[in-house]
Every structure is written in structure tokens, then in C-alpha cells.
UniProtKB/Swiss-Prot annotation:
Keyword flag Nucleotide-binding: yes
EC number: 2.7.11.32, 2.7.4.27
Record's keyword annotation contains Membrane: no
Keywords: Kinase, Nucleotide-binding, Serine/threonine-protein kinase, Transferase
Catalytic activity entry: N(tele)-phospho-L-histidyl/L-threonyl-[pyruvate, phosphate dikinase] + ADP = N(tele)-phospho-L-histidyl/O-phospho-L-threonyl-[pyruvate, phosphate dikinase] + AMP + H(+); N(tele)-phospho-L-histidyl/O-phospho-L-threonyl-[pyruvate, phosphate dikinase] + phosphate + H(+) = N(tele)-phospho-L-histidyl/L-threonyl-[pyruvate, phosphate dikinase] + diphosphate
The protein, known as: Putative pyruvate, phosphate dikinase regulatory protein
EC class name: transferase
PANTHER family in the cross-refs: PYRUVATE, PHOSPHATE DIKINASE REGULATORY PROTEIN 1, CHLOROPLASTIC
Family the UniProt entry places it in: Belongs to the pyruvate, phosphate/water dikinase regulatory protein family. PDRP subfamily.
GO molecular function list: ADP binding; ATP binding; phosphotransferase activity, phosphate group as acceptor; protein serine/threonine kinase activity
Role description: Bifunctional serine/threonine kinase and phosphorylase involved in the regulation of the pyruvate, phosphate dikinase (PPDK) by catalyzing its phosphorylation/dephosphorylation.
Binding site for ADP: 150-157
């Protein structure tokens, strides 16, 4: 395996650079990457600390930095070391400007940063996801954008949180074998309801690992194949009867599941808004 060092430098959370790096790395099966994360680099003092690390561990640099002087310092430093220094969204911004004929606006001033509606919508969505996790506060489901249902340990909670980071309010409700399901499923609701299912054998592995972590040995039904299989089949049945989409998460990451849900949600929203 070829080792590859990548430095992710950002004035925010480095997530954009991280997604770009991982997408590119997926094309190289023989590479063993080592990613160094350098978030919240917003002044020269912090940047100089990062530069010393880059000098010690040479590697490709991917960056998302708004401040022009910091960008110049970083790119000049990498040029002198003869290592690649790539702006993740720089070319995109430039092409947008050229195509639209609109000049790039002034650099971000973090000291005067204004929290916009998107920021507060995201905070509200995260708060909603936390308060409506695992079937809590069902009386407020009408406020949700998306409702996830599925057996325990089918990634409902992390998917709800991921959706929240994208500004969507998501509630999740577990389905437990032989337990009555909330009566909301018998009503006409406007929210998008999505069922999450998984291969029963895979779900048993996940549940057994969970029980071992908690040092619980008594709950045999939780990992019984027949019961686990019935839970997944029943969720499919509930969704099929109501024309709700079902997503098999057996081989999907949280990001992939959330992306598919968002695609369904926005396609549905666009259809109804025509």
C-alpha cells in the first residue's frame, strides 16, 4: 500500500475538504491515506502552527480558507516546499464569477460574522432531532419534515442528526416486535415517512455488539433471527401499505442514507410545489 499524507486546512470545520479528499481517495484502492485535520484556522498565528506541522510531515494540502492573506501565506509556503496546495472550492467560485459576470464579493470578516437564517434553522433542526429521538414527543410530529421508522439499530438516530445538519427536522420512531405502533400511521400526514430496514444477519451482528458493550446477556429476543426478520418484514409491510419509501441500509453509510432521503424529500417537495 502506498502511504499518502493529506493536510486538511480550513477556517471552519474541515468537512468540505474532508468530503473532497475522501471522494478522491475512493478512486485509489492501493493508497493508505493519513489525514491531518486543521480546523478553525482564522489568523496568522494559528496558520503558522499548521505550517510547521506541514513542514514536518510533507503531504498534499487541501484548504478552504476565505481570508486572502492567509491563503497567500499558505500557498506560498507550499510552493516553496514543492508540495501540492489545492483550494477545494476556489476554482468553483472563479468559474461562477466568470460565467455569471458577477465579481467575487469581499472576503469574509469573522469578527463581524452575521448568523443568518440558515444557521438558526440548522440549530432548530438539531434540537428537534434530539428531542424527537427514539419515539419521543409524538404529539409534535406535525412539525417534522421527515419521520424515520425502523427496527432498533438501523441508524435512525445518526441519520436524523445528519439530516438536521442539513436543516431538515427529522423525528425517528423504533419498531419493536409485538409492540403496538403509534397511531399516527393510521392518519393522513403531510410529512415524508421513510422506513429503514437492514439485512437481519447484519442487524443481529450490530445488536450483539451493542449488548456486549453494555454487558447485557439476558435480552435473547433482541438478537433472535426470527424476531429480527419479522421486525424488518413488518416495517416493509407498513410502508408498502401506505406507499412510503423503504431504504435498505445494509451496505449504506449514514451519509449515503441521508443523501437518498434528502433526494426523495426534495423531489417530493418540488412535485407538490409545482
Amino acid at each position: 500500500m502506498t502511504k499518502l499524507i493529506i493536510h486538511l486546512v480550513s477556517d471552519s470545520s474541515v468537512q468540505t475538504a474532508k468530503y473532497a479528499a475522501n471522494s478522491a481517495l475512493a478512486q485509489f484502492t492501493s493508497v493508505k491515506p493519513k489525514l491531518y485535520h486543521w480546523p478553525m484556522i482564522r489568523n496568522l498565528e494559528l496558520l503558522n502552527e499548521v505550517l510547521s506541522k506541514i513542514e514536518y510531515k510533507h503531504g498534499i494540502v487541501l484548504y478552504t480558507i476565505a481570508d486572502q492573506e492567509l491563503r497567500k501565506t499558505l500557498t506560498k509556503f507550499c510552493y516553496e516546499l514543492k508540495i501540492p496546495c489545492i483550494s477545494v472550492i476556489g476554482k468553483i467560485i472563479k468559474e461562477m464569477s466568470v460565467f455569471s459576470g458577477i465579481e467575487i464579493e469581499k472576503e469574509q470578516n469573522y469578527n463581524n460574522y452575521k448568523f443568518d437564517k440558515t444557521y438558526f434553522d440548522t440549530l432548530n433542526a438539531i434540537d428537534y432531532a434530539i428531542r424527537h429521538d427514539d419515539g419521543q414527543m409524538l404529539n409534535e410530529l406535525s412539525e417534522a419534515d421527515i419521520i424515520l421508522i425502523g427496527p432498533s439499530r438501523t441508524s435512525k438516530t445518526p441519520t436524523s442528526v445528519f439530516l438536521a445538519y442539513n436543516g431538515l427536522k427529522a423525528a425517528n420512531i423504533p419498531y419493536v416486535y409485538n409492540c403496538p405502533f403509534p397511531d399516527f400511521i393510521e392518519k393522513d400526514i403531510d410529512q415524508l415517512v421513510v422506513g429503514l430496514v437492514i439485512n437481519p444477519n447484519r442487524l443481529i451482528e450490530i445488536r450483539e455488539a451493542r449488548l456486549n458493550l453494555l454487558q447485557i446477556n439476558e435480552n435473547k429476543s433482541y438478537t433472535d433471527f426470527n424476531i429480527v426478520q419479522k421486525e424488518c418484514l413488518e416495517v416493509r409491510k407498513i410502508c408498502d401499505q401506505r406507499n412510503w419509501p423503504v431504504i435498505d441500509v445494509s451496505t449504506r453509510s449514514i451519509e449515503e442514507t441521508a443523501a437518498l432521503i434528502m433526494r426523495i424529500y426534495y423531489n417530493r417537495k418540488n412535485k407538490y410545489n409545482k
